[in-house]
């Protein structure tokens, strides 16, 4: 099947059809054919013009193949968060854990394909902020609100990777230095790796990150299966046991927290428009997306289930590296995670930096050429982002719980609500207010599906935020909240 037909079912064979020829009074299928051909032509023309404008630039942005884009996606999704899936399964039970992992993966794939279709229709879109503006009445206010959420989301992910970098260094060195120093070191190293100006330039690092992470989780899974006992094994507790379904005393907050943990690992659609905007052939993005999603579902499910079965409810930690009984096993498997500890923060820093940089230097020679002003500004923006990320990570004593709140609020929009609305927006533009009738059975099914997607987003925004806030309250009550700018050990076995 032609890729444009995947994006726009019923693609017309006449490439010269334009929007003016699309008569709403035509039969639905013929009308859709006229429209899809028009959008396909518009995409080709716009991308061609963008590539042509870069012909004499020394820095070319539309250079990513679908393979390089797949590497970026693999590095974004195949990450440390995988090692928290065993904990989620221990809370939810094996059967619900597997079902929810597969279900969330499929829903995120569907919404990501909606993003792809939207970007093909409107190839001038550069990032999620442009989409937000277009979806909600072309409002500049919505653009600014989306930009604030976009930058906060990305910066908080950078902050998280400052902390997990410090966690790794503390674990390996037995807390040989102040945690603040370790997290600052992580920020400094990440700044250096953030310097490439294009996603194509980052793709090799992304490939290394994804491969190393896969090795890390594979080793951890094998080690959990072959060692005699997990860490803190106690003969009085007995051997590890696992449950097919949640324990009877599992609370709503605990169960929802485990579900959110699974969902947050899948939700990464915020970067997709930025990736598509730098592809040579945006119509090939579905290949990258499908390959990564299949790998995600398989890896997340197997790692979560296998480690949970061998570690059990009694000895589970998050991340699951801490459950390995042999310290050497733990250090070896955790060490292969280093590239992703660095690169995932780098990727989000790069997405934020180009968002700012492009808007400052759009239409100038500094954007596409090696100029002192261009490079000084690029480095300055990145440095500012990493310094801010480090300060946030160290200044907020309940940062991890705050990240859950941010994830629930922002994930509701960037993971679900935006893309349900995007489907309705495109269908309304093509077929009018009764689009679901004109599209037949498919129209009704997709309408129900996308309304469900929006409702899931609202669930994240409401109960999801409540569960995250309640987690912060419980941490305070249990004395689990530390202090700001602390040197305290945050290693896995501190």
Residue ranges, per PLM feature:
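Non-cytosolic membrane-interface motifs at loop->transmembrane helix junctions
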Residues: 405-409
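Intrinsically disordered, low-complexity regions flanking or connecting the multi-pass transmembrane cores
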Residues: 1-394, 404, 414-494
């Amino acid at each position: 099947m032609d890729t444009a037909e995947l994006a726009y079912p019923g693609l017309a064979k006449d490439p010269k059809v334009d929007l003016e020829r699309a008569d709403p009074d035509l039969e639905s299928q013929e009308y859709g054919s006229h429209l899809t051909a028009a959008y396909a032509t518009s995409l080709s023309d716009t991308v061609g013009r963008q590539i042509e404008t870069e012909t004499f630039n020394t820095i070319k942005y539309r250079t990513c193949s679908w393979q390089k884009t797949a590497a970026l996606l693999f590095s974004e999704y195949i990450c440390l968060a995988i090692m928290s899936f065993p904990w989620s399964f221990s809370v939810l039970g094996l059967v619900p854990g597997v079902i929810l992992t597969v279900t969330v993966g499929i829903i995120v794939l569907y919404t990501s394909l909606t993003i792809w279709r939207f970007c093909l229709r409107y190839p001038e879109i550069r990032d999620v902020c442009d989409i937000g503006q277009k979806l909600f009445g072309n409002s500049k206010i919505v653009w600014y609100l989306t930009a604030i959420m976009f930058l906060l989301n990305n910066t908080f992910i950078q902050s998280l990777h400052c902390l997990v970098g410090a966690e790794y260094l503390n674990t390996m060195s037995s807390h040989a230095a102040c945690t603040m120093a370790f997290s600052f070191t992580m920020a400094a190293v990440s700044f250096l790796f953030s310097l490439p100006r294009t996603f194509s330039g980052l793709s090799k690092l992304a490939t290394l990150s994804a491969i190393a992470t896969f090795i890390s989780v594979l080793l951890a899974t094998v080690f959990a299966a072959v060692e005699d006992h997990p860490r803190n094994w106690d003969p009085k507790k007995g051997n590890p046991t696992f449950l097919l379904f949640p324990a009877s005393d599992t609370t709503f907050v605990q169960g929802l927290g485990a579900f959110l943990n699974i969902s947050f690992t899948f939700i990464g659609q915020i970067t997709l428009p930025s990736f598509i905007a730098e592809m040579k052939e945006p119509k090939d993005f579905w290949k990258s997306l499908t390959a990564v999603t299949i790998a995600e579902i398989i890896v997340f499910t197997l790692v979560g289930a296998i480690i949970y079965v061998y570690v059990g409810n009694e000895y589970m930690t998050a991340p699951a590296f801490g459950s390995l009984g042999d310290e050497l096993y733990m250090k070896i498997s955790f060490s292969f995670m280093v590239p992703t500890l660095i690169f995932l923060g780098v990727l989000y820093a790069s997405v934020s930096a180009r968002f700012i940089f492009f808007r400052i230097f759009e239409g100038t020679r500094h954007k596409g050429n090696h100029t002192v002003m261009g490079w000084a500004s690029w480095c300055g923006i990145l440095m500012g982002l990493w310094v801010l990320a480090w300060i946030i990570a160290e200044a907020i004593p309940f940062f991890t719980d705050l990240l859950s709140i941010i994830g629930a609020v922002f994930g509701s929009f960037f993971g679900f609500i935006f893309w349900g609305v995007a489907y309705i927006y495109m269908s309304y533009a093509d077929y009018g207010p009764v689009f679901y009738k004109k599209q037949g059975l498919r129209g009704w099914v997709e309408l129900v599906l996308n309304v469900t997607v929006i409702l899931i987003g609202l669930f994240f925004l409401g109960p999801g935020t409540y569960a995250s806030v309640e987690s912060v309250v419980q941490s305070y009550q249990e004395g689990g909240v530390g202090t700001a700018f602390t040197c305290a050990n945050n290693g896995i076995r501190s």
